[in-house]
From Swiss-Prot:
One of its GO terms (cellular component) is cytoplasm. The keyword Cytoplasm applies. This is Ribosome maturation factor RimM. It is found in: Cytoplasm.
């Protein structure tokens, strides 16, 4: 049984596929078939899973794990989330402007004046662009676009995001934000 220090969600198991113990899984990796390249996958209940075979099928991957040899065993895994340790992700493959979702969670969102808008509690991709979920103490969560206009700077070492609250949709009054999303300010 393994307890991960800094778990990163890599896949969610769906239904069984066929009779040999294969399962359909939704992989949260850029290359779904690379799921096996990260080593053992772990569930929150402490079990470890070794991938023996993996192939793509439509919007999912079909996976066969060591020790899962029939349909009944595969069906018992339905809905199981599989994780790896954050240290198993290759940092050297990231560009300067690329980040793992797991690294963004927990960062504090600040504007240029140091005002906090909460911490990142989730990162979502609904197809039209990534969204960051911010949650402040005593506040409801809000979603902001994870774009160059909204998120101006990311400092992983300091644990902060510099945001433009106007571009992020957190304020309505341009006077509350020094940034105007590239629009020139009117002279009086």
């Amino acid at each position: 049984m393994t307890k991960l220090e800094n778990p990163v969600l890599m896949a969610t198991i769906g239904g069984a596929q066929g009779l040999r113990g294969e399962v359909r899984a939704k992989a949260y990796t850029a290359d779904p078939t690379a799921l096996g390249d990260y080593g053992l996958l772990h569930s929150t209940d402490g079990r470890s899973f070794e991938i023996l075979e993996i192939r793509e099928m439509k919007n999912v991957v079909v996976v066969r794990f060591r020790g899962i040899n029939d349909r009944n065993a595969a069906e018992a895994l339905n809905g199981l989330e599989l994780y790896i340790e954050r240290d198993n992700l290759p940092d050297e493959e990231l560009e300067d402007d690329e980040f793992y979702y797991a690294d963004l969670e927990g960062l504090e969102a600040l504007d240029d004046k140091g005002v906090s808008y909460g911490t990142v509690t989730g990162v979502f991709d609904f197809g039209a662009g990534d969204l960051l979920e911010l949650k402040g103490p005593g506040k409801r969560p809000v979603l902001i676009p994870f774009s160059e206009a909204s998120v101006l700077e990311i400092d992983l070492e300091a644990g902060t995001l510099l945001i433009d609250p106007l571009a992020a949709g957190l304020v309505d009054d341009p006077e509350l934000s020094q940034f105007t999303a590239g629009k020139p300010k009117k002279k009086k």
